[in-house]
Amino acid sequence: MNLVSRYAPSPSGPLHLGNLRTALFAWLQARWSHSIFILRIDDLDGPRTVHRMAEQAIEDLTWLGLDWDQGPVNNSSNNLGDLSIKGSCGPYFQSKCDDHYTKAFNKLKESGYLYKCVCS
């Protein structure tokens, strides 16, 4: 079995040192073990998502010398927003996964595996 490592920043603001540390550790693990490194954008929190922060995170990670095998990449060094996707295991933006989540939910529901949470 091959190891897959991923980093999933939230585009709610600029990357900070904690984000960069996590990205670096995930990247180092992937490169050390000769495995796949995936960049996935965790853009599910719509109200907190800041315009162009995903593109800026990609630019910042690239500037730091980190690369990834799958995920969104910036096609132009001077035009944030000119993104393409590399890899075939996407979608690499969480907001594009609704169909997958709906199918999984319906399968659990049909199988009788859903239950109410009784947490406080």
Describe the function of each predicted region.
Residues 1-119:
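N-terminal Rossmann-like or analogous alpha/beta NTP/dinucleotide-binding catalytic cores
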